[in-house]
Amino acid sequence: MFIEVEKFVEARTNSIAQLLKAIDNDALVSGEVTKGPRTAAQRLPRHMRRRAMAYDIRRFPRTMREFAAAHLISKHAKKCPSRFARRKSANSRTKFGRSTSTKGIWLSTHVWHAKRFRMIQKWGFKLADRSFQRGFRAVLRDSNKNCVIRDRSYYTCVTIQCTDAYSKISQFSQKGCRGQSSRDEEEECHQLYMPGKYPFGYIGPARFQRLSGDKVHIWIHPSSKLQFMKALLEYYNLEKQENTEEDLYKNSEIKVSIDAENICRFHLSGPKCLSKLRDSIRFVNDEKFSSEHNYFLSVSDSVFQSSRDGEVINLLIEDPRTTWDRKTVLKHKKVNKEADNERIRVSKFWNKEFREMAIEKRMADSEFHKQNSSKINGVISTEAKVPIILIIRNEGLKALDGADILIPEPFAKDFWVSLQRRGVRASGLRDEYAAHLESKALYYPLDDVGSEAGRESELAMKKELIEKYLGKPHNRRCKHWSAVSVKYPFEFKWDELSQDWNLSNKPRSEAFVCRDLQKLRIIEEAMKKGSGLEEFQEPGMLIPVKLQFFGRGRPKKYGMVCLPTDDDLISIRKNRNREIIQTPPEASSQDSDIVEAMEIEEITVKKNQGFMSLEAAASEKPINLKLLFEETTKLDDKTTKRKRVNRKKRESKKRRKIEQEKRKEEAEVEEVQKLATKYRFSANREIIGRLVAGEQSVLAGHGVGIGYICANTLSLIASNYHKSKTVVMVRNSTSKYYHPAYVTILKNATKI
């Protein structure tokens, strides 16, 4: 089909005229072909245009900025946030409410910690383990010179109400295992046992606070909560009450309630903890609490060690958010120590209605920040008046002494942030464990060996270490038995060790820890004298001790405490850094003959070894003919290569099978040798105990360890080095070197 060009152009004359008019438009900038500029930048010549004009109004000429501003606002308006961002806060609150014991319950400071700490699941909670920053030494330094805070809100508060509640709950406690007795409302630490099973049936430590004759508050570690509640319910025949907001158990006489969510507990440690706390709170002007406030101010200005351990101070403060401003310096009046004589105790914290009223009056965060920004000095006071309890912790444990703070849960995070803005350093579980070791105190439940919680933590640690050990290649694993002669590298086996040292005719008994403080003091005096220890040689009794290395050495957990020989003591006096090496276990006579024959065969020297032959044929080597001719096909090369690879695979498989069978035989031989060897004599020095914790002390500059030794061995080591000093040999489970260390009885009770 053909068309006539003249008729086609005549029919479209008007369209062509409009196109030419648009192209030749004098109003447009030179070079533009569009009708009317679409943006402000297109009104400029090409040499004046910049890509940044779409974002920065200052790129336009001054005469065009007012016109271009409207284009930029409409084009770059803030877009709507994503669906995830819009629902982030609501999802966080929902997730906080959904957190259960299976995934780990969140504490009130969880979000703050999760941004700064590595979180782990422990005892049914999500807890902060260690900081992302490298502040391990800084935390220890501040715990001795400044102030450190730890969140211990995972402790469980159990309230017991009945007539003479303190005497009834004392059925689970042993008087000789605790320190000083409390006065009035003071808090004290008890060691809980199953009724009628002492010295066995240890449950764990707990803190008691009695308000009156009919009410006692007990703070207990979550790892021992189930065992304690089970024993309490069975002993008093308590029944759980249904349709109640909190866990409630009672009978005709006793009422037991568990409050694990409404109260938070913080621990401040360090010499400046009271002064930091004073600068972080704003007191409510209430006459009822004026004497308590004055007493706290007098204590905060005085020497911290002058306060009594367990002393309770009740305070009423404003909303902690009112002290968030770092520039605001709170000025409190100075009060003398004589305020103690006029002190009137007022306690509103344990009044549930008073706490709930403060929670209801708490101002929302959005409203608080709105009012705080509109006022010159910020918000100074709100309707919410927060009751808190301050508990002095003066136990003589260096890095652990300080104060505990009890505060209602909705105000806990605000109070935490207020302390952070005053320079208080936060720490996690690893730092707390290190602080216990620096203070030479047992850390419950990881260092405890007599309770169910301690045994469970030991099994969990054993499982973790075995998985890590089996994950290494065979040639990178430590040969604990054949190389360093360690029978149990990942466990303690206290029952077996105590039985090996049971030299009397008394019946076999399970291992238990001596926690009687008076008995431990008598044992320490007897060790200094070197006599009178025979009466304490009970079968199965373990004595907690602390070890101080005075030479080289860095003790570790699962280290062995051994009995030194006379030669060891002589060599230590000459050179305390001399290394005593552990020899591997002796093999049987048949095995030794084989080893000797193999050594003779390997040492056999050839006739002409070391001489060069002068014969020409001696230096000749066979040459492969295939390498001389290039006529070999590629197919032959591929076939040869494939055969070579397959041959290597078969050889490697055969070699692995032989090595696997060899390792299996060696493991069976080792098991037979272990069964035939007593735990006590498994090393070339008699084992008398094990280490449950140990590390190089940052503050002292030498190795420090904590462990247990059998009571039957005390007479063998008493004052063996000096009139008042006892020395033992310590060896780690992965080392072959023995190191000397002073041993001292640990007289501090296990505390939380």
Swiss-Prot record:
Pfam families given in the database record: POP1_C, POP1_N, POPLD
Top-level EC class: hydrolase
Keyword RNA-binding found: yes
Gene Ontology cellular component annotations, sorted alphabetically: nucleolar ribonuclease P complex; ribonuclease MRP complex
GO molecular function, one term: hydrolase activity
UniProt feature, compositional bias: Basic residues: 640-657
Key words, A-Z: Hydrolase, Nucleus, RNA-binding, tRNA processing
Protein name: Ribonucleases P/MRP protein subunit popl-1
Source organism (scientific name): Caenorhabditis elegans
Gene from which this protein is expressed: popl-1
